[in-house]
């Protein structure tokens, strides 16, 4: 399935005003389970930081994580980078109108982006599955972190991440829900090895999207996006659909962030320089 066209439509719908963009961020916060996991990790990290911090939002997209960080602590300086010019322009316009002067945005390719020893935290949410040269990006992240700086990653795992499933009984062919991914997901061992090869000394990997998260993702993301990929007319019934499933999906999200998972379709990775 092509995910980018849906994102462009959503961007066009919610870019009309500052309040609509804020509403869009709130909806993403409620519906995207990975946001719950990332914010939990950021809150834990923030308790180790006294005062100002420099943060890189690597693959900032719609800018919802930069928005969260910029509002959480005005002394933090956030740089969001992305390869999509329209998203950088949208974020620059919105953050200026919202009066958030501690966040800036830059068009950049992560395979070439290095700011030597500049950041206390680098955030990479659902980005690495889109980049073929991941080893180069991990090395760039390492070089761009300050000593003891933290890299925080959310990415699909190899346990069914990207909703990968076999197409026949022989299990020799697989398809992914998201066509734009260059890899279906990482194993714990693979991403740990690649990060250590990049220079990181301490790597912690935990599964996200366990059984509760998988149910929530299907209800809140897979089924609606699949319908929208058929016809944009389904936008009309989405509010009714989400009212019907929201509280159950919320319960599943709460369970997912509070349980330890032996397996899951997502990974939350923390790597320290």
Model-derived features with residue positions:
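S-adenosyl-L-methionine-dependent methyltransferase catalytic module, highlighting the catalytic core
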Residues: 2-37, 64, 83-87, 94, ...
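Conserved SAM-binding loop
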Residues: 36-46, 50-167, 269-271
